[in-house]
Amino acid sequence: FAKKLNLPENHSYTRAALLGALAVKEAIFQANLKLDGDTGFISGTSVGGMDATETYFKDFSEGKTDNNRFIRAQHPGFTTEKIAEYFEVNGFVSTISTACSSGANAIMLGARMIKTGKLKRVIVGGTDCLTKFTLNGFNSLMILSNEQCKPFDENRKGLNLGEGAAYLVLE
């Protein structure tokens, strides 16, 4: 993903930030948007940079750590900040972290910001990556399915986790 964004090999983007940046890039392209100071960015995420936590734990176990990198990358807002930084969005930038509804809440907040005249346009959506933390959390609830996803089937056996990102431009 980093190559598609022309990032250096030693970049500090988490997987969630990379997924998000690619989705934002696509949204900007599809909207034929020219970013300016009137553009806001609201991003939803459940676990944000949790993949950085897993990397940190591995590094810690091997005796090679960078606490500052870990502290910055672990909070959900870091993902939003890295994406906004990449696209040079310097206006209103906010993170919504309300579990599975984060992206939907980002869209609702963006629409309200436009409706009330606080923003002319805003990029809204969400990003999350699959991590051991997330997988183990849902596994501990014993609600994961080992079968193919079939959400509307009355014989479904649980849920299937995934990762992804989606953003759109509201004006």
Please provide the spans of the model-predicted regions:
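Conserved active-site "lid/cap" helical segment
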Residues: 1-43, 49-50
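Acyl-thioester C-C bond-transforming condensing/cleaving domain
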Residues: 29-38, 48-171
